[in-house]
């Protein structure tokens, strides 16, 4: 039997019994299941007895071993107690040793201090004695004119003097030593100049060593600067006396300076510890000592160029300077972080500072330049067709000038002149809009839209309308170009001047700007050539405005901007004026006919058969000539509007949707949304005709019964024309014709649902008492 399963964690009694019976299936099958069960029980009892016996034996052995374990534990406790006592004793010994050692070390320190003082005193005495010895021998040494020996003596005297600081005659000795150094410098100066001029490396190294030892390195560098500065200044003088233009002279100067840079760097690297810094100072001093100075040369060059060319010439000069600056930057860039950035910044300032006054007033210069160029763009011509042509051609000229101004701003100010640029652009657009408006007024006069003779014959002339449509298309080009240009301007400003915008700044205050900018500059080493910023220090208010613009562009995105809001609004108004011109070119001839209605004598004069009018049917009357002309003119409008308004022209479509026509639909009119602009124009002209007709009718002082019927016939004719064109007659016109047709005895009843003032006016005209 397998008794090992009793030890399993998942032991199941039923499963074990079933397994035991399955093992003895033969006996169970023969009907001896009870016997088999009895056998299993007996085996289990025997197994239990064996287990009990084993447990008793194990327990007995454990009880026998317990006293031994207890004894071991007791012994361990005694050993731990003894160890604790020993640790306490060791701790006391260590504490005592530390106290004894501390006292010993204190004594040693005091002894060492005494020793150091004694050595210092001995050295001081030796140096003091050395000063006396050297002072006595120095005159003899100078007679040898051996610079190395004299330098060694002076170095010894200098070291001795450091030990004599507290002596009463210390200052006198300092003066004496400086006088000796001056004598040495005077003695060596011819050789120094010769060494630097001939680029003698070994001899120059000797002088560097000598002057370093006697603390006269700045004086030695002054000789170096003077030697090479003289050569560069002479080259500039020669250029100035030549017949070359100023930009060529500047190019020659910068070539000489850049050549000197590369030559001197190679030589100075062998002689000086900081060759780049030394040569940078040479260039800084040379640029500052030029005669005539660069600012005066630039001033003369700009003045000679005149107002029309001053900015162009200035940019030519600046391009030469920028090319030179780029060459220096490339030369310094590989090891820029190793150089003295203060000196690099001074060099950058020395190169660019002559242009600072012009950069600060760039906005004014650009505005003057743009206005001069805009004045050269003709818009006004003798013939209307020529004016229209010039207006169309002026669009590309206008935005060509604006784009060129942006390029100049980037080239000359690196984006810092953005505020001045925006101001100049606004002036440019204002000038253009003013000229455009004047041209529109001139076209109106040439087309005689403002002064149509009262007695002129009614005739169709669509030339003015055709020209007006071309002008509207030009306005569409202006609006489209303005949107594109504004987007490009925003992107250009952000990409160029965006580097000046600190990531941490918020445009709440100027102080916040400057604080964040200073913090950023401390946190990251930057390239002074790329970070040149003339505006922040010299015009902080304009710089703050620039930061506002950049912050807005960055936060809201360059597509959501308002840089040219005023010019855009002005161009929109210009488009509106062009719409008015086109509208007037069509409508004013109708208006001229309608305004004559109130002055016609026939309204209050009895016609032939006046007494029979009441008996005559309405269709016996025919519309008068004035309304027939107007009706025929309006009927011809679709044919004349369609070709010009619905042609495939995106600029024209843009302008037509941006403009607003006069005489909009009356409130409450159910009009379908018309995508066809020709229908919109037709509706506007029709409504203008009806409203003007109504106003003219109400100005008639008196109507005879016949005239009332005639006028009603005229109005019905116009209403039929409107119906034929699919247009709704105005409510006022319908009311008037109703009142004109109403019999006097029915007038009170009919007029109850109509506007009171209108009913009263018509009643007065008809002499109806109600």
From Swiss-Prot:
Keywords (A to Z) from UniProt: Congenital disorder of glycosylation, Golgi apparatus, Membrane, Protein transport, Transport
Q: How does it assemble?
A: Component of the conserved oligomeric Golgi complex which is composed of eight different subunits and is required for normal Golgi morphology and localization.
Recall the taxonomic lineage recorded for the source organism. Answer: Eukaryota, Metazoa, Chordata, Craniata, Vertebrata
Q: What family is it from?
A: Belongs to the COG7 family.
The superkingdom listed in its UniProt entry is Eukaryota
Origin species: Homo sapiens (Human)
This one is known as: Conserved oligomeric Golgi complex subunit 7
Provide the protein's localization. Answer: Golgi apparatus membrane
Recorded topology in the membrane: Peripheral membrane protein
Q: What is its main location?
A: Golgi
**Any one biological process term the GO annotation gives:** Golgi organization
Q: What does this protein do?
A: Required for normal Golgi function.
Q: State the disease linkage annotated in the record.
A: Congenital disorder of glycosylation 2E: A multisystem disorder caused by a defect in glycoprotein biosynthesis and characterized by under-glycosylated serum glycoproteins. Congenital disorders of glycosylation result in a wide variety of clinical features, such as defects in the nervous system development, psychomotor retardation, dysmorphic features, hypotonia, coagulation disorders, and immunodeficiency. The broad spectrum of features reflects the critical role of N-glycoproteins during embryonic development, differentiation, and maintenance of cell functions.
Tell me which InterPro entries the record gives: COG7
Q: What S-S linkages are listed for this chain?
A: none
Q: Which GO terms describe its cellular component?
A: Golgi apparatus; Golgi membrane; Golgi transport complex; intracellular membrane-bounded organelle; nucleolus; trans-Golgi network membrane
